[in-house]
């Protein structure tokens, strides 16, 4: 009997120890310093829901556990790596870009080059064919004036259905042709004056003008000399007292001063 009681007491003692250890463990879990298991479970469930919502949510949370049943949780922000789709339409931009309008106009203006007998040759653009009405209107305007201002040229081109370049080229060709005809003498000066330009007048020869002026001056000098009194050929009365002086000597003596006076008067006129 004593052995039976001893075994019963031993079992009871072991049960008490087990229950006490269970209660102590339960209280330690309910202490404020340790996280509650229910909160931990709810956070884990929330993290699992976030992971299911985003394709990159599996790496959004990290959990570190140690041997003492303590868990520390680190939450990180989830970044959406969707910029590849946003810039998708511009991936091939730059490899083939459409030409600008300036480049297109430049290409149109450049003449076409073809190979003729192994040599490059520029192909001329076809000439503009003007209608009868357009030619008549251009000719009438050319008779009024040979040079057009920019507003006049734009107005004339719009009224005739032509471009300003075509009108400008027509006037340039017409002016060059008109000058050639006028220089060759096929166009009279009156028509050239009517068209807006005055022909150059031939200048008189300078030699003829100088001869006319010189002859007029000489006539004036001669008329002045003819009006003057002729020299006195008689001997003055005061020379009669000197018998050695004759009339021939007096005439010869008085003649040089006469020529001298003529020279002085002519120089004064000139």
Swiss-Prot record:
One Pfam family of this protein, by short name?
DLL_N
Q: Where is the composition biased (Low complexity)?
A: 54-64
Q: What is its main location?
A: nucleus
Compartments reported by the entry = Nucleus
Where's the DNA-binding part?
123-182
The GO cellular component terms are: nucleus
Q: Where is the composition biased (Polar residues)?
A: 30-52
List this protein's GO terms for biological process. cartilage development; cell differentiation; embryonic skeletal system development; embryonic viscerocranium morphogenesis; negative regulation of photoreceptor cell differentiation; neural crest cell development; peripheral nervous system development; pharyngeal system development
Record region (Disordered): 19-64
- Tissue expression from the record: Expressed in the developing forebrain and fins.
Q: What does this protein do?
A: Involved in the development of the inner ear.
**This protein's name:** Homeobox protein Dlx2a
The source organism is Danio rerio (Zebrafish)
Q: Which gene encodes it?
A: dlx2a
